[in-house]
Regions:
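Short, acidic/polar
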Residues: 50-61, 105-114, 203-209, 255
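Acidic (Asp/Glu)-rich catalytic clusters
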Residues: 35, 60-64, 78-94, 109-120, ...
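Acidic-and-aromatic substrate-binding clefts and catalytic sites of carbohydrate-active enzymes
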Residues: 48-52, 71-81, 100-107, 130-134, ...
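Active-site acidic/histidine proton-transfer and metal-coordination neighborhood
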Residues: 16, 21-23, 68-69, 93, ...
């Protein structure tokens, strides 16, 4: 569905009976509940093109929407002091940042230093490059690298983590890469930032992982999809480009069902993302409005 086929607020004002309300799918209703997202965050990759031209101005627009937290995906040449200043000016905090896989070796000490200087809690690796994923041993190698990075990060008073896409949920040599990472990574050194949209698009239930690995998921990426795609291992590499992403709440993912398990999962940070929004500011505004009103 698109932006919602029925305007919820208008419908609830005009509907004459409770029976009419019951006809709406449950995920479309902001039914009263005791739980909510206290601080909605956003991955700044969503507004990356705007950030290139106006770093400070774009962050100000993010704050004006109502966001309280941001996750970085690059600093566009700014120093740690400059980044910290723009966050403070706009009443924002950054709990996390994304750093590339090839930055986890010789460059990692400087990554840690910068991250600590802007008061980050988490350093997240968001992706393992496609060429490396052709190696059947990559997931064991990645787990070893993540554990080492986790040790360094922990010594600096922060936490290391990994962000998934879709390919971690497709069998490799008879095993799921995501399962291998969870088994091989030290739970105290490596946490998971689960991208709830990507895992859902593979037909995998995130709640299953919350139940099996409680407390391992302090951060989640929250984005939506208009329709659930079909995926096969043969088309895995280009799968991401075929997914029709949309603003949170205007797609088909049942957020109430997932968030009902937030406590067991250990979720502390809910981070909005849209990989290819046509109108980035309008996109993150729509997602913010939905999440800020959501109750479960």
């Amino acid at each position: 569905m698109n932006v919602h086929a029925v305007n919820r607020r208008t419908f609830l004002k005009t509907a004459g009976t409770a029976a009419a309300v019951s006809l709406l799918p449950s995920r479309l209703l902001w039914a009263a509940g005791e739980h909510k997202v206290n601080k909605v965050g956003v991955q700044l990759y969503t507004v990356r093109d705007l950030m290139k031209n106006d770093f400070e101005g774009t962050i100000a627009k993010v704050a004006q929407i109502g966001y309280k937290e941001v996750e970085f995906a690059g600093y566009f040449g700014r120093t740690a002091d400059q980044v910290k200043a723009v966050l403070e000016k706009n009443g924002l905090r950054a709990p996390s940042t994304h750093v590339q896989y090839d930055e986890l070796d010789d460059k990692f000490p400087s990554v840690i230093e910068f991250s600590k200087a802007i008061d980050l809690e988490y350093i997240i690796c968001p992706w393992i490059p496609e060429d490396l994923r052709k190696n059947p041993d990559i997931w064991k190698q990645a787990a070893d690298k993540f554990n080492k990075a986790g040790e360094q990060t922990k010594k600096a008073g922060m936490q290391f983590g990994y962000h998934n896409h879709w390919f971690e949920f497709l069998p490799t040599n008879g095993k799921l890469p995501y399962d291998e990472l969870l088994k091989l990574c030290d739970a105290n050194l490596v946490k998971m930032e689960m991208d709830l949209c990507w895992i859902e698009t593979t037909g995998t239930d995130p709640v299953k992982y919350f139940d099996q690995y409680p407390g391992r998921f302090p951060l989640v990426h929250v984005k939506d999809v208009k329709t659930m795609p079909k995926i096969s291992s043969g088309g895995a590499q280009n799968f991401g480009d075929t997914v029709d992403l949309t603003e949170v709440g205007s797609g088909v993912i049942d957020w109430k069902r997932i968030f009902a398990h937030s406590e067991k999962a250990g979720i502390k940070h809910y981070i909005v993302e849209h990989d290819h929004p046509k109108q980035p500011i309008e996109s993150i505004k729509g997602s913010y409005e939905y999440l800020s009103k959501l109750r479960w």
